[in-house]
A protein has these predicted regions:
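N-terminal pre-domains immediately preceding structured catalytic cores
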Residues: 1-163, 167-351
């Protein structure tokens, strides 16, 4: 299969418990200062939360966040482009919400090899061969934010250069996006469009919303270092990038404890397709060689635990209280788990 399914739960170093469940968020409130017309279409800076209203997509984290006036108000787990069709990086903007979109297959080898659709031959809205689902949101060629994905595709490679969501996720996202863009879009409106799957409807936002596409495999979140898998094999999990990230918070590697440094460097290697970076062992001092041996042992132990995992979390004391915000009101795309059926024993205890 071309799809690589990654585990939902991260591995956490330095603590026996997993990440705390984030508190539920609140719907955005209209705000004149949130108008993107007053916001320059420029990156907010590596590793940082934006000070304005925009969408942040970080491909290695399989995550999309909505910020309003610098506050994170909503998060989504997403599917990303396959390695041969990667999600690009850079600044885009969203100015339309298109309900029940048609799809014109592009002139690509994966379309030409298909026996179901032909290049340039329009596929109708609502057709089972249309992969875009109930909504598409253009963010600049060749990328879209669109629905149509099964829950199993969320958190995986799932598209040809787009942000992929389930239909329920993209409907939720469209309502928040519309409100930020100055357009009223009610639950009833969304339901009406879903009922009329053959009818394409374009909703134009009064204010286009900036969309920042990132490729950051290193992040500080909630006082912890998150090391994401280098999904597009861009050699980003290296010491030089770690030092740049720490420098954002006024730290250096020397500010970490020996155990923290060992765990961190092991995590970088374990989450890299091509571990390493600039490392000439012949020029290392004896002390550096000893440290490298510790890192290699930790990496080997960690790698055995990480098959299929998408991130490692390392607790670093000096980062306490710092970093990008944790997900808010996260929609994972997964169906809710049914409540456990009480056993006879628990029913007896309940009496």
């Amino acid at each position: 299969s071309d799809t690589i399914t990654l585990a939902e739960e991260p591995t956490v170093l330095g603590t026996p418990s997993l990440m705390d469940v984030p508190p539920a968020g609140t719907p955005p409130s209209p705000s004149p200062s949130a108008s993107p017309a007053k916001v320059a279409l420029t990156p907010s800076g590596p590793f940082l939360a934006p000070p304005d209203t925009r969408i942040i997509v970080n491909a290695p984290a399989h995550r999309m966040d909505i910020f309003q006036d610098g506050q994170l108000i909503k998060s989504y787990s997403i599917g990303i482009g396959y390695p041969e069709f990667p999600l690009p990086a850079g600044m885009r903007k969203a100015g339309q919400i298109i309900f029940n979109p048609t799809w014109t297959p592009p002139d690509e080898p994966w379309v030409e090899s298909s026996s179901k659709v032909k290049v340039g031959q329009k596929v109708a809205a609502g057709d089972r061969l249309n992969p875009l689902g109930v909504i598409k949101i253009p963010i600049g060629m060749p990328s879209l934010i669109h629905g149509g994905k099964q829950p199993a595709k969320i958190g995986t490679f799932a598209s040809h250069g787009c942000v992929g969501m389930t239909d329920k996720q993209v409907q939720s996202f469209a309502k928040v996006l519309a409100q930020l863009g100055g357009v009223a879009l009610s639950d009833e409106d969304v339901a009406k469009h879903e009922q009329n799957r053959k009818e394409t409807k374009v909703v134009q936002l009064k204010n286009a919303i900036p969309v920042e596409l990132r490729y950051e495999t290193l992040a500080v979140e909630g006082g912890k270092l998150h090391v994401y898998r280098d999904v597009y094999d861009r050699a980003t999990n290296v010491k030089e990038n770690l030092e740049a990230l720490l420098g954002t918070y006024g730290l250096t590697l020397a500010d970490l404890t020996e155990a923290e440094r060992t765990q961190t460097m092991a995590a970088l290697a374990a989450m890299s397709r091509q571990p390493g970076g600039k490392n000439d062992s012949a020029n290392l001092t004896e002390a550096e060689k000893a440290e490298q041996r510790k890192i290699n042992i930790a990496r080997q132990q960690l790698t055995s635990q990480l098959k299929g995992r998408k991130e490692v979390i390392v607790e670093i004391a000096a980062l306490a209280g710092k970093g990008y915000p944790a997900p808010v009101d996260l929609e994972t795309g997964k169906p809710p788990q049914p409540a456990a059926t009480p056993t006879k024993e628990t029913r007896k205890k309940g009496k």
